[in-house]
Amino acid sequence: AAKEVLDIQIRAGILIPTDGEVRRENYIHYHCRHLAGFDFNKLEHRVLRDGAYETDLPAIRGKVLTSGKSYSAHDYLASQAVSSQPVKFTLPGPLTIMDTTADCFYDDRPKLNADLADTINKEVLALVDAGCKYIQVDEPLFARAVKDALDFGMEGLERCFHGVPKSVTRIVHMCCGYPDHLDDHDYKKANPSSYHDLSKSIDEADFDQVSIEDKHCCNDLNLLEKFQYKTVIFGSLAIASSRLETTEEIVERLKAALNHIDRDRLVVAPDCGLGLLPTQLAEDKLRVMCKAAALI
């Protein structure tokens, strides 16, 4: 399955593909299943994402610790073995894990964030040892919880990447959230103005690239001028829409973006993962995006 996903991306022109997280039943809980302290048997009911949805969540009932062998290195090596391009590996960030699990033990958000970051760091370092050159931590919760992000979340992110050499590109993804099906225009997304509130801390933090959405939210492009040091991965495909973008509209937006940031610090990508899209539509969107990038 990972090979099929990688082949689709490479065929479309993607230079740094991912494994599509096809081994994971949930992109957050997959990590948590490899940790001590989590209870997946007795779930807790919670309302999430500012009321966007409610569900039953695994509970934290003890100190969060790594348990056993790293999963990330195994998954990365299996994917890299069937890819002609360097594979980027993605992991959920500590603040996002906190929002998608039920804390019944810590009652101390900064402490829980730090302990989760330590477990992520162990996976990150295992990826480094396995030869992975592109490692991404996903923190969509930053856009919804700006105060937490600034108070302790950014420190947690840096903790995730502690000990990573400069030869490895350290990436953080911050989108504004998506529904569980296509073309849901009533879904309550995070306010994209959060990017402006976070920009200074992001730019000063100890990682290399920040991935933001733009197609779904159409940012004020002055935002890009606030990133003086970071490379920006610029979301250019609507991943929760069945509409196929045109090459021309993506080219136009990228040209506008380049009025605000240096060319060598702008990377083109989808807003987020493509899991909501049918396979052929996902490939068509990627192909259009790659064609647009090649024209700039």
Language model regions located:
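Domain-level signal for soluble alpha/beta catalytic cores
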Residues: 1-296
